[in-house]
Amino acid sequence: MSDVIKTDVLIIGAGPCGLFAAFELGLLDMKAHFVDILDKVGGQCAELYPEKPIYDIPGIPHVSGQGLTDALMEQIKPFHPTFHLGEMVETVEKIGDPAFRCTTDAGKVFECKVLVIAAGGGSFQPKRPPVPGIEAYEGTSVHYAVRKMETFRDKNVLIVGGGDSALDWTLNLHPVAKRITLLHRRDEFRAAPHSVEQMRALVAAGKMDLRLGQVTSLAGTDGKLTGATIKGNDNNVTEIACDAMLPFFGLTMKLGPVANWGIALENNLVPVETSAFETNISGIFAIGDINTYPGKIKLILCGFHEGALMSQKAHRYVYPEKRLVFQYTTSSSSLQKKLGVS
């Protein structure tokens, strides 16, 4: 077992609602750690519509999904939250009243007094490519997210996909890997034009390979990949050496392991009471799109409201002997000091 990471609050989901919750918690002296299955913060905003304008954030006439994420990250800087990205909380065990032990699929173990589920519609799950036997290599040679770039040092890496993730990791891993092969169904990419230009320049210089087609089979033993068979768009079949494969076929939304934690569910959503958005288990809260209650509206601004009320109740669990005196950031010198503006 890895060393236990102890924190006041563990937040599952680093989208806008989770990020703002960390701000509210920080004002009340509660330390937060985040776990998110995505390899970057921002949730749906950053993953699905980073450049799409949002028009219903109070006081901000319009902002992009990435712009909102960047602003929230700047806002929570004074509280130094810790992020564990590319991971998913698999198990939650109650060890106190309240206290919880949470374990991720990467083997990290957290102990917290408060657990906040801010996972949007659930966890983003990578789409598995239709390659026979690929399951045997998952987690050892086939990866759906990059957790450590060093994992791919001096390896022949096959990256499959044509979106931003595929292009970004092609460029980022190029200096690390022995050889990068990018495979896509067609010679058109749904990625930032500058990234596509950089990739094509590397191909032209002979520093990486670009192939058009799809993977039809994998070769290897004991979960260790040694090669892949590719059927090209011209129907020619070739074999390439590869030690690692990174398929980026997009994401699908699933409730995920939440269903196994003993939390009450209602149509794949988490019902909560509306004074603090607590679930049926004391100390576990749900905010944002994943929760449900009478009159629920799935707006980011509603999730901000939920995070503010949640933090007030969370304070009772983290500091049971401490009386909470409500303060305003406009007039409280102690809050301004925490924010570094006094």
Curated annotation (Swiss-Prot):
InterPro entries, per database record: FAD/NAD-bd_sf, FAD/NAD-binding_dom, Fd--NADP_Rdtase_type_2, Ferredoxin-NADP_redctase_2
Stored SUPFAM superfamilies: FAD/NAD(P)-binding domain (SSF51905)
Required cofactor(s): FAD
Top EC class, one word: oxidoreductase
Cofactor remark from the record: Binds 1 FAD per subunit.
Binding residues for FAD: C17, D36, Q44, Y49, V89, F124, D289, T330
Key words, A-Z: FAD, Flavoprotein, NADP, Oxidoreductase
Record-level GO BP terms: cell redox homeostasis
One Pfam family hit: Pyr_redox_2
Example GO molecular function: flavin adenine dinucleotide binding
EC number: 1.18.1.2
Catalysed reaction, written as an equation: 2 reduced [2Fe-2S]-[ferredoxin] + NADP(+) + H(+) = 2 oxidized [2Fe-2S]-[ferredoxin] + NADPH
Tree of life domain: Bacteria
Protein family: Belongs to the ferredoxin--NADP reductase type 2 family.
Oligomeric and partner information: Homodimer.
Protein name: Ferredoxin--NADP reductase
